[in-house]
Amino acid sequence: IHAAQGYARASSRLGVVIVTSGPGATNVITGIADAMIDSTPLLVICGQVGTAALGTDAFQETDLIGMAVPISKWTMQIRRPEDVAPAVAKAVYIAMTGRPGPVVLDFTKDAQIGSAPFIYSKCSFIRSYLPVPETDPESVAKAVELIDESSRPLVVCGQGVILSGAEKELMEFVRKGGIPVA
């Protein structure tokens, strides 16, 4: 998982990780959390037991979805082969848009060994997903006021500036304000 993170960060492309169920699933948890914290786009694909065996403590059954929900942008367990293409399209869209981050797809054995016609269409909109949050004008006005009142303002920024493509805006802001940046 850490190699996929390195690839994603160095290339600005999606890193992909494929692991087995059980120990494979548990071993990616730290990497998923790290990718979430660092805004690294990852697609984590994990194997899982058959649908009929879910919840029975079957050999190497691990609730990756339950573990990954709080540390990823989106998770889905895929139980039917016909759900594979739409789930992958949605996962890639979510991982790469807005603040990038990890998404997790948990493929049951049924989804892995079944077959369905391959119909893939790129996802470009999800009704309940807002990749770019709305700006609150009151918060912006308050920030301007705080900066104006500050005797020695300093801008400390990270890779979010690069991820959002705001390098020019940042440089214009600090030049106009005469504010040092780190």
Regions found by a protein language model. Name each.
Residues 1-182:
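N-terminal alpha/beta PP-like core and its mobile active-site loop of ThDP/TPP-dependent enzymes
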